[in-house]
Amino acid sequence: MSKVVVCAMYKFVSLPDFERIQKPLLIVMEKSGIKGTLLLAKEGINGTVAGSQSAIDALLAWLATQPGLDNIVHKLSFDDDMPFYRTKVKLKKEIVTMGVEGIDPNEVVGTYVKPKDWNALISDPEVLLVDTRNDYEVKIGTFENALDPQTATFREFPEYVKQNLDPTKHKKVAMFCTGGIRCEKSTAYLKEQGFEDVYHLEGGILKYLEEVKQEESMWQGECFVFDNRVAVNHDLEKGQYDQCNACRMPITEAEKASSQFEQGVSCPHCIDKVTDKQRERFLERERQVQLSKQRGEAHIGSDVSAVIESRRAKKEQLKKSQNEKSV
């Protein structure tokens, strides 16, 4: 059986008429049997899709015929099963949401560092290494000596920079993310804030794992991915983690054996965050999932926003109380 090809792609490029591309792009994906989601915005394209090798090749070839969408940054990995259920092309304000107006990586961006040169850069004691990903991603893997901003979403990253980084003290800053898109936008933001020597890993963690031998690697753990694989190891194969359907946190087999874990309802990370009302909803959703499995169907749907909002609200409350104490 042929492996499913998973293609993560993005490109920051000015697309003033991005709405025009939505329908024909969706048609190309559906005709080729490709599943996954692509985002379109004025600032470019971003997303992860999966299909046969010929289907992915055809998609990239079609995109190359569209103004500005040639030479899209993309990384390929493989899976035994299709990691997505739906085929979607969404129109967005940003292809990766930072929530800061005027940040344009097409105009200002940090220095790209190729995977083969990354180890030397982050081994420099003068370089501050920052992981731009979310807390649940950092939990299962990161680079040696990287700072964890402990952000719940990428929207929180600008505030982390304001509170913790200083262009007069931190002369060299290197950043990384899964595929390169968040750290590219992060470097653009830091440059706008007055940081001079700002670097980011070209192609992200996935490209690093692809090109750097494991015995030479400074990566520790696995890399979280936004599909049903949950995480990939250094060989870019499905890793050891599963995912809690209630809070999206990656979980180990040991955590699944915990009394606090209930399939589709809770895990040790969110057991104290799930309300009785959410629990009822999650139980019903899990019942529908199991019924779908019995019928041989894929159940589509995820209702995790309440738990995520709860996590975010608690973080905001903590920050507020800390600020009040410092006044």
Swiss-Prot record:
EC class, as a word, reads: oxidoreductase
Q: Where is the Rhodanese domain?
A: 123-217
Which sites are catalytic?
Answer: 177 (cysteine persulfide intermediate)
UniProt keywords, alphabetically: Oxidoreductase, tRNA processing
Q: Give the enzyme's EC designation.
A: 1.14.-.-
**Disulfide linkage:** none
Catalytic activity entry: uridine(34) in tRNA + AH2 + O2 = 5-hydroxyuridine(34) in tRNA + A + H2O
The domain of life is Bacteria
Extract one GO molecular function annotation from the record: oxidoreductase activity, acting on paired donors, with incorporation or reduction of molecular oxygen
Name any Gene Ontology BP term: tRNA modification
| PANTHER family attached to this UniProt entry | RHODANESE-LIKE DOMAIN-CONTAINING PROTEIN 7-RELATED, THIOSULFATE SULFURTRANSFERASE/RHODANESE-LIKE DOMAIN-CONTAINING PROTEIN 2
Q: What does this protein do?
A: Catalyzes oxygen-dependent 5-hydroxyuridine (ho5U) modification at position 34 in tRNAs.
| Database matches in HAMAP family | TrhO
Q: Which family does it belong to?
A: Belongs to the TrhO family.
Q: What is this protein called?
A: tRNA uridine(34) hydroxylase
The species this protein was found in = Shewanella piezotolerans (strain WP3 / JCM 13877)
